[in-house]
Amino acid sequence: MQKKNLITAALPYVNNIPHLGNLVQVLSADAFARYSRMMGIETLYVCGTDEYGTATETKALIEKTTPEELCNKYHAIHKSIYEWFNIKFDIFGRTTNKYHKETVQDLFLKLDKNGYITEKENEQFFCQQDQMFLADRYVTGECPNCGNNTKGDQCENCSNLLVTNELLNPRCIICKNIPIIKKTKHLYIDLPKIKNELEHWIQQIDQNTNWNINAIKITNAFLRDGLKERTITRDLKWGIPVPKKEYENKVFYVWFDAPIGYISITKEIIKDWESWWKNNEDTNLIQFIGKDNILFHTIMFPSIELGSQENWTMLNKLASSEYLNYENLKFSKSAGTGIFGNDVITTEIPSDVWRFYIYYNRPEKADFQFMWDDFMERINSELIGNFSNLINRVLTFYKKFFGDKIDKIELNENFWQIVNIKYERTINFFKQIELKAALKEILDISRIGNKIFQDKEPWKTKNSTPQTTKELLLNLIYLIRDLSILISPFMPHTSDRIRSFFGKSYEISNKFLGTNLGLTTIQSTEVLFTKLEKQLIDSLKLKYSGRTNMQDEKNKNSINLFSEQICLKTVKIKTIDRNPDAEKLFILKLDDGTPEGKQIVSSIADHYTEEELIGKHIIIVDNLKPAKFRGIRSEGMLIATKDENKNFKIIIVEDFKDNPIPGERVILESDTGKELKSPTKISIDKFLQAQIVAENGELKINGINLILEHSKEKVLSKEIPNGKIY
């Protein structure tokens, strides 16, 4: 009997917006869960938000709200981001669910009854200013192991679990004062007492097969250093109350209650939850985590299960990943560095494209740097130039010259012998949770298809040997069906689109792989993806590069930069069309004072109708390098004001000047009377480095007004008086 797969992704803290690095675990677990279902394995994928503890309490203090309101806010944000990424949880719950308290307290009482809970008086930081004991994340200081600045629970730099009062140069995060040491009582889990059972369990697991190298190293090092009693209570209000006399005013430490959340969240949707969580014989527990969570899943959570002396389903496979970082910078919402889940949605780059790149570079054995230029290169060459190209060229060619009907043929033995070996390798990589290797194997299969199409030159043989050519193409069509199945764990929407080309006449199942089943007609075809343009990527790179990276060394003086390298002009909008491949993109034909005029493409359809803009005069960056958006050439960029609330308005010249003149330049007031330069073409990065702003309704650079060259009228932003110009 085949075992069931119980899959979890580390519960994300509900005190922030997830960035790309945070998404690695939920996406990895999603791909594995989809693979598991594809193989016909009974599968349950559980995740949810981790809502209790100091991280939530401290964030609520910062946002001046209650922990409950904060959790409601960020749970909704997380849920919407994961939905956009098309992550197929069986349940995405919360540790504030109705079963969590009783589940945590029940496990604690069993540990206490079995003699695995101890009491200790210890010394803890106490803030005299705020008159409270400071739980670990209420204290910042220097890690005693590596010297990195950290909070008091775990060092993000060296991953060591910390004892809070060992921090060097500690400070209270609320008032920034130096705390004192004061005695208090806490409860501990007696890890040394569980050590023998824990080590016996670890020895039974084939770590070399089921855990990655880093997880093995970190766990073995922790065991080698000797297990110590670990505190499980905290002096907080927001948490699961401790059901023990004299401890009623304390709550459980979040590391103790959070892993139990996997169980309580499961209870929300499955009455017979024990068939998953108390069924070690028939269930594989597969957990996806970041490297900073390894010890909580290999030592702490298993110790709780073992200490309860019940038949809990124990960890089998552990898929821990390294960090995904950003352009050699640290993800920081406040500093504006890195791209976060809500930012990704606004890029208008499809979710499957993001999924592809994250899996392609999944940090399985080493940290990985997200780089915009590499993102563009991989998408354009691998996803589009290889994978999408095969599907488009084969289906359109077959449909054009051989019609819609797909004949059932005997498959070419030599071709499929090679391909089936690749299928076996792909499935094995999935099974071992080597997701990056699985994806690259799929891309290799696609390359084989492209090479055969290119080498056999069906465009030359379609008339001379039509049947042979048709059979060649049919073999490739069955290969495309298989690719749509294999790629589905990584790019489910793309898989569905390919299946729709065939009327969804087959299921996402490994049973179809390498067969001549499931295909009857080609109902439709379309291009799956469009290339990422450099202008878009450059603008996104700049947007998320952080305040300190907005200018390069050559152009620190934004006034000189504008005068010497930027040309703004007034233009009249003559016509507006919508891009047939992208409804949100307007194609604007402009009168710029020249006989040929100008054309720009702009994503403003969400903000304006055609009728509001036709006939109006606007200002454009006239010397921007031409670029293509969804295949349409754009020869400039209109300018607009955006404020801190993301309100957006185009600069309309009629707001401050009657009878504007198409082609009139916009200059700095300080350049009046000077000979103006005709600057060379520039990138959008260069324009943004000028840092034009709206101040009290007037456009300025470093306090100097922008004006129309001939009329000397000041350029105004009437509807949004204060903001940045983009």
UniProtKB/Swiss-Prot annotation:
Its main location: cytoplasm. It catalyses: tRNA(Met) + L-methionine + ATP = L-methionyl-tRNA(Met) + AMP + diphosphate. A motif ('KMSKS' region) lies at residues 330-334. Zn(2+) binds at C143, C146, C155, C158. Its EC number is 6.1.1.10. Keywords: Aminoacyl-tRNA synthetase, ATP-binding, Cytoplasm, Ligase, Metal-binding, Nucleotide-binding, Protein biosynthesis, RNA-binding, tRNA-binding, Zinc. One of its GO terms (biological process) is methionyl-tRNA aminoacylation. Binds 1 zinc ion per subunit. Residues 562-667 form the tRNA-binding domain. Pfam families: Anticodon_3, tRNA-synt_1g, tRNA_bind. It is found in: Cytoplasm. One of its GO terms (cellular component) is cytosol. GO terms for molecular function: ATP binding; metal ion binding; methionine-tRNA ligase activity; tRNA binding. It comes from the Bacteria. ATP binds at K333. It is an enzyme of class 6 (ligase). Belongs to the class-I aminoacyl-tRNA synthetase family. MetG type 1 subfamily. Is required not only for elongation of protein synthesis but also for the initiation of all mRNA translation through initiator tRNA(fMet) aminoacylation. NCBIfam families: metG (TIGR00398), PRK00133.1 (NF001100). Homodimer. This is Methionine--tRNA ligase. It comes from Borrelia recurrentis (strain A1).
